[in-house]
């Protein structure tokens, strides 16, 4: 039974990974459009603006650098996209003309990052695997720091096998609050959306043991993986998690 539930959750996470899904939505917008602009490039631009809503020219240049590295080419592309009414420009920032539907946004908020596993992760046998059951294989090295060099897989597998559960007292009595210190990571509106999604996820995992996967950074430090539920979260997030197996520790 758990394997079917696990696969269903992973399918949702794979479908609603944030940027890939927004690029897909951008592609749907431009698919039938009558334009001479490169539709693949246009879909990517619209995807970024669906995420950020508005961006300065310098930010757009950074986001699109791998796609259109030529400054003059990008400038002409943005001008044409504005003239053809795919985006707006207010003199300072490029602004999206499209919004994600409320239903789609809710799914993105909930499934934009792989959720904790309901069953013990698959054994990681090489650097390209990640412990999940569907073959995504994001690897155990964070970001783009892929390597074929030997890393300690035994440690990753040991951490992955630790069974966890929610601290129901903390779920019911503790509260996550936005502060100005969070402004660099998310604004109040984004925080409120995150909070709503997190509460739904916590309800889904109530009374259900779960597992977190782990990855290394390029320096060899290990990090638990998770967005709504993560050991290495803020104080509120940390308070939500208990070991499933408990022992009384005596002097």
Q: Would you name each region that the model predicts?
A:
Residues 1-251:
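Non-catalytic nucleic-acid-binding interfaces of large nucleic-acid enzymes and RNP effectors
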